[in-house]
């Protein structure tokens, strides 16, 4: 039962992300911003704080990595607005107020506010639009993120617990599941780093996912090179992405 629940939750997350990608306005740009923010914050944290700073006990690098990892809300807020065509100054205004929020709630808030800002840019005269955005956008972004954060985090915790339960009961089954899902996710606009961070995979499940990705990423590299899909850079990208 735990295996079915874990597989079902993984599939549900992928289906929701795919539907958002296909049917939501600026869905692809939004997910690219989400993926970019995850890579810009969590990847430096993983390398600097854990892989280098933690292993060699270099506190300076640990502090830098932890700082980068704590700014995911700002990063996703700015990148989401920029990808949706919002002026850079307005994007930074929105991103800064999302400092204390996790990746997904901050993304949802920034995604919604971006459409409001685009409407303001069209309707309000240039120069005055800055004042209007300052008065409206930060408050709405902060309020929206505050409202949805408890529900979003509780849902993600339940999903992550279901996946973790599979690893506790049958690690081989979880290896098969993650070995299939994560590399395939890395070959799409969806990011495997975003997927694993949203699911909250840590400890044994993350280790299982890393082991399976090591083999399947190499297969991706050979497959793309032999089939001449997208050239050498594309083959290298689909190999490296799941390993992040």
Language-model features: locations:
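Pore-lining transmembrane helices
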Residues: 2-244
């Amino acid at each position: 039962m735990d295996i079915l629940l874990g597989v079902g939750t993984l599939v549900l997350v992928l289906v929701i992300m795919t539907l958002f990608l296909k049917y939501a306005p600026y869905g692809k740009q939004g997910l690219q911003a989400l993926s970019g923010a995850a890579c810009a914050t969590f990847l430096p944290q993983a390398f600097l704080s854990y892989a280098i700073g933690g292993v060699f006990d270099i506190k300076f690098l640990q502090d830098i990595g932890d700082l980068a990892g704590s700014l995911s809300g700002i990063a996703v807020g700015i990148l989401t607005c920029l990808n949706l065509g919002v002026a850079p100054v307005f994007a930074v205004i929105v991103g800064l107020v999302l400092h204390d929020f996790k990746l997904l709630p901050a993304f949802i808030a920034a995604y919604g506010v971006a459409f409001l800002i685009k409407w303001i840019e069209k309707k309000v005269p240039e120069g005055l639009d800055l004042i209007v955005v300052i008065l409206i956008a930060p408050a709405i972004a902060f309020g929206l993120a505050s409202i949805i954060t408890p529900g979003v985090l509780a849902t993600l915790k339940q999903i992550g617990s279901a996946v973790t339960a599979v690893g506790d009961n049958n690690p081989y089954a979880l290896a098969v599941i993650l070995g299939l899902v994560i590399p395939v996710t890395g070959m799409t606009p969806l990011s495997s780093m975003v997927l694993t961070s949203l699911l909250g995979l840590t400890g044994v499940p993350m280790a299982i996912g890393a082991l399976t990705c090591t083999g399947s990423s190499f297969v991706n590299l050979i497959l793309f090179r032999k089939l001449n899909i997208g050239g050498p850079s594309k083959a290298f990208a689909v190999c490296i992405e799941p390993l992040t």
